[in-house]
């Protein structure tokens, strides 16, 4: 069992990764032709959303493509309902969770499923993302394949639980905006940090070859790449963003008389850390509550400022009745025409126009008792 275990772990994922280099990647910019349903030789399609991508759908797609039936699958990145309807399986988009039709979205207001709710007896109560849903429904089969054993093998049960608790749950929690800490106890494990990945390059206790030289070279390559990537980010993205945030703060009263709404000239820039630092330096009378900006598609976003830099709790979330709604349903409840969505946790929403995004922020401000002062505020 030991050799078969290691052979399954070390060879099958690598083979799948190498094969993936030669597969097509569908996109909104280059839309795929609709797959003829009667063409049994056509490769399967995995649908997910286009635009900014996140760890959960990347992991969901990667897990699926490790399975034989999806090994040659085409990834179709779109939000077009007709194109998604032509896909064999859809993850993280579509507003539907239906394993019978292979639809695995978690953004809809009605979705509250956890590993515990769908697998009675499991202890984990973190809301599932698309990664967790795919892992829940396909994980045992995938692990059995990678381990070179059957799904009935007790090893699969053990590894299934271990991989969820120490890998997938973290992805679920982060994507759903769930804080790791509550009452001093961690809700889920964080095991994919750079230090942890370097540590895992060391030989395991039961590997015949305990030489660390090759692993150390790989570790150097790993940390060098991440160091240079981070340096490049700070130099070319993070630092220039400070000037944009500083200018936005200076112009905030031209955006709204409350002074609580900031408009970024360029969307997508890393603004949060700069905002906290600048608030500390400038000591505005009230806290900045919302940031509005355009996304990659040219639509407008209204994002709530978190209470703290790494918190998932907002200073003022968008109204509860709006959360998890989209399009006309959201228009009706909010009274603001042209809405696109509000996230289920209320930390972000979308609108087709700048004025609409502003109105979403203003309507939220109007519903709270009083502005939120900063602890170090001084009168301006």
UniProtKB/Swiss-Prot annotation:
Its EC number is 3.1.-.-. The modification N6-acetyllysine is found at residues 266, 272. Keywords: Acetylation, Hydrolase, Mitochondrion, Nuclease, Nucleus, Transit peptide. Pfam families: MYG1_exonuc (PF03690). GO terms for molecular function: 3'-5'-RNA exonuclease activity. Its main location: nucleus. It is an enzyme of class 3 (hydrolase). The keyword Membrane does not apply. GO terms for biological process: locomotory exploration behavior; mitochondrial RNA metabolic process; mRNA processing; rRNA processing. This is MYG1 exonuclease.
């Amino acid at each position: 069992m030991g050799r078969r275990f290691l052979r399954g772990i070390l060879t099958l994922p690598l083979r799948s990764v190498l094969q993936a280099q030669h597969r097509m990647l569908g996109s909104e910019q280059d839309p795929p032709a609709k797959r003829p349903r009667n063409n049994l030789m056509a490769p399967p399609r995995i649908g997910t959303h286009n635009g900014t991508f996140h760890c959960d759908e990347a992991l969901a797609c990667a897990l699926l493509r490790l399975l034989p039936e999806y090994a040659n699958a085409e990834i179709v990145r779109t939000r077009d309902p007709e194109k998604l309807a032509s896909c064999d399986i859809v993850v993280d988009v579509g507003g539907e969770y239906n394993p019978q039709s292979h639809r695995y979205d978690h953004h809809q207001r009605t979705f509250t499923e956890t590993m515990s709710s769908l697998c009675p007896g499991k202890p984990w109560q973190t809301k599932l993302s698309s990664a967790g849903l795919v892992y829940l429904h396909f994980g045992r089969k995938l692990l059995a394949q990678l381990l070179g054993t059957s799904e009935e093998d007790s090893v699969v049960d053990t590894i299934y639980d271990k991989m969820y608790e120490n890998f997938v749950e973290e992805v679920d929690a982060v994507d759903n905006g769930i804080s790791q800490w509550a009452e001093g106890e961690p809700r889920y494990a964080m095991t994919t940090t750079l230090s942890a990945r370097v540590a895992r390059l060391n030989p395991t206790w039961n590997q015949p070859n305990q030489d660390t030289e090759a692993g150390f070279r790989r570790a150097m390559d790993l940390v060098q790449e991440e160091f240079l990537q981070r340096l490049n980010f700070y130099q070319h993205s993070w630092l220039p963003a400070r000037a944009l945030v500083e200018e936005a703060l200076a112009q905030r009263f031209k955006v709204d008389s409350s002074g609580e709404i900031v408009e970024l000239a360029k969307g997508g820039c890393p603004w949060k850390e700069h905002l906290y630092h600048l608030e500390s330096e400038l000591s505005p009378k009230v806290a900045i509550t919302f940031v509005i900006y355009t996304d990659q598609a040219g639509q407008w976003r209204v994002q709530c400022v978190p209470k703290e830099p790494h918190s998932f709790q907002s200073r003022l979330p968008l109204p509860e009745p709006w959360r998890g709604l989209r399009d006309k349903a959201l228009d009706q409840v909010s009274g603001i025409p042209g809405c696109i969505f509000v996230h289920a946790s209320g930390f972000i929403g979308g609108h087709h126009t700048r004025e609409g995004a502003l109105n979403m922020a203003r309507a939220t401000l109007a519903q709270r008792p009083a502005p939120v002062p900063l602890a170090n505020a001084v009168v301006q």
